[in-house]
């Protein structure tokens, strides 16, 4: 587990070293979960903003000096002003994302149990993300450190017990139990010309396997089959490296490997790389820009090894397609599958539609409806006498924005033919997600 001492040390290092660079030049359209959060907060780069009238000093402690020189308290004390000052002084982009998600599930008594579970199930979510540009020059290229951490806590009933009561093979949210994972801590070097990037460190394929609204419980759909690749067996965060080829702004190709042991991403361990078991993957993304709007089409192929934490060797794949069919309509789909017996789902078919700011009221407003059918992996589920081969979920949500930082999202999930409750035709989950983004 990453300790607060480690996080504090990382923060002090970020403030203690001066960097003389511009903000990252991201190719647009290629979805990345953590960079998407930062880009949402920073729709325009610092480079494009008006120059500061505050003099900046260049020394070992210049970032600290520049923070005080920018007078973040002059318009009143606020976390937002302080973060903005830190970002400008250290050449970073920071996103702090908080979420509280109560979910009411029916039935709330597991099959064969006499006592009902407590409802709602309360999930607390916190995820800080940072992009720190160390340098950016025509001769040296661009060097960036990316960091993202996820903390999940439950009160009353956790997601595992709630799923068991509802009888679903897939989860009712993205994180079904208490966990802490280091999703990303990488250094990436983009060489002059922007064609080739080498990244080393800890990262997860969950960040790239998906599109704008079917890859992140925090900002889109909540049910696992609609917020993730439901058959994925890759790590939540593991050490390794990848090469990225970017021949133009519309095409991106990655080839990489990771150690096979750190399935849950709970620590940062280079030692695992000496154990000679590695996961490999290849990924390609295309982001055309037709007249109707931006789109993204991607394919991911991966293999994971058999290790004590995951008792099956797996070959998996994922096909994603998303397209703005109108200025405010975003259509997406996904087909994914995996071999082996690592997870209770070995194939999913997903289709959904999201309307962005449908009433021209607030930029965070969303209306979404999605449908997923999951093929159940019977060999991965034990202690169940009767089991359905397929399970489907229909989900609808509405995100309502309040000011620049807060949003509320009522959410409804209808599970049709829940796999672990063959005596029931449906199970239901109601949720209300409250987000705070700084």
From Swiss-Prot:
<dbReference type="GO" id="GO:0006865">
    <property type="term" value="P:amino acid transport"/>
</dbReference>
<keyword id="KW-0626">Porin</keyword>
<comment type="function">
    <text>Facilitates L-arginine uptake, as part of the AaxABC system. The arginine uptake by the bacterium in the macrophage may be a virulence factor against the host innate immune response.</text>
</comment>
<keyword id="KW-1134">Transmembrane beta strand</keyword>
<feature type="signal peptide">
    <location>
        <begin position="1"/>
        <end position="21"/>
    </location>
</feature>
<keyword id="KW-0843">Virulence</keyword>
<keyword id="KW-0812">Transmembrane</keyword>
<comment type="similarity">
    <text>Belongs to the OprB family.</text>
</comment>
<keyword id="KW-0998">Cell outer membrane</keyword>
<dbReference type="GO" id="GO:0009279">
    <property type="term" value="C:cell outer membrane"/>
</dbReference>
<dbReference type="InterPro" id="IPR007049">
    <property type="entry name" value="Carb-sel_porin_OprB"/>
</dbReference>
<dbReference type="GO" id="GO:0008643">
    <property type="term" value="P:carbohydrate transport"/>
</dbReference>
<keyword id="KW-0732">Signal</keyword>
<keyword id="KW-0406">Ion transport</keyword>
<dbReference type="GO" id="GO:0015288">
    <property type="term" value="F:porin activity"/>
</dbReference>
<protein>
    <recommendedName>
        <fullName>Porin AaxA</fullName>
    </recommendedName>
</protein>
<keyword id="KW-0472">Membrane</keyword>
<dbReference type="GO" id="GO:0046930">
    <property type="term" value="C:pore complex"/>
</dbReference>
<dbReference type="InterPro" id="IPR038673">
    <property type="entry name" value="OprB_sf"/>
</dbReference>
<keyword id="KW-0813">Transport</keyword>
<keyword id="KW-0029">Amino-acid transport</keyword>
<dbReference type="GO" id="GO:0006811">
    <property type="term" value="P:monoatomic ion transport"/>
</dbReference>
<dbReference type="Pfam" id="PF04966">
    <property type="entry name" value="OprB"/>
</dbReference>
């Amino acid at each position: 587990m990453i300790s607060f001492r480690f996080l504090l040390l990382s923060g002090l290092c970020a403030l203690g070293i001066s960097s003389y660079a511009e903000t990252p030049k991201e190719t647009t359209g290629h979805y990345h979960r953590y960079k998407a959060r930062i880009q949402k907060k920073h729709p325009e780069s610092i480079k494009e903003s008006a120059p500061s009238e505050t003099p900046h000093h260049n020394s070992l402690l210049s970032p600290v000096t520049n923070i005080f020189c920018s007078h973040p308290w002059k318009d009143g004390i606020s976390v937002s002003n302080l973060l903005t000052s830190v970002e400008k002084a250290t050449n970073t982009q920071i996103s702090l994302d908080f979420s509280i998600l109560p979910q009411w599930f029916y039935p709330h008594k597991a099959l064969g149990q006499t006592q009902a579970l407590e409802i709602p199930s309360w999930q607390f979510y916190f995820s800080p993300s940072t992009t720190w540009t160390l340098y950016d020059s025509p001769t040296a290229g661009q060097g960036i450190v990316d960091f993202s951490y996820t903390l999940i806590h439950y009160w009353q009933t956790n997601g595992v017990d709630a799923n068991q009561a509802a009888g679903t093979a897939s989860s009712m949210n993205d994180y079904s139990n208490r966990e802490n994972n280091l999703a990303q801590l990488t250094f990436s070097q983009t060489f002059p010309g922007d064609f080739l990037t080498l990244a080393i460190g800890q990262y997860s394929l969950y960040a790239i396997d998906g599109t704008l609204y079917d890859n992140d419980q925090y900002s889109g759909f909540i049910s696992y089959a609609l917020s993730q690749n439901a058959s994925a067996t890759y790590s939540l965060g593991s050490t390794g490296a990848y090469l990225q080829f970017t021949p133009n702004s519309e095409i991106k190709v990655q080839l990489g490997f990771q150690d096979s042991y750190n399935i849950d991403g709970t620590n940062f361990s280079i030692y695992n790389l000496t154990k000679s078991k590695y996961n490999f993957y290849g990924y390609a993304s295309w982001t055309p820009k037709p007249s109707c709007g931006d789109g993204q089409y991607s394919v991911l192929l991966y293999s994971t090894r058999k290790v004590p934490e995951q008792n099956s060797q797996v070959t998996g794949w994922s096909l994603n397609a998303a397209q703005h069919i109108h200025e405010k309509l975003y259509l997406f789909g996904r087909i994914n599958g995996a071999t082996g017996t690592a997870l209770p789902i070995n194939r999913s078919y997903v289709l959904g539609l999201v309307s962005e700011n449908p009433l021209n009221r607030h930029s965070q407003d969303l209306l979404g409806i999605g449908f997923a059918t999951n093929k159940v992996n019977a060999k991965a589920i034990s202690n169940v006498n009767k089991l359905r081969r397929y399970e489907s979920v229909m989900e609808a949500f509405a995100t309502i924005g309040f000011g620049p930082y807060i949003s509320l999202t009522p959410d409804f999930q209808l599970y049709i033919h829940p796999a672990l409750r063959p005596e029931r035709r449906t199970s239901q989950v109601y949720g209300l997600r409250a987000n705070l983004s700084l």
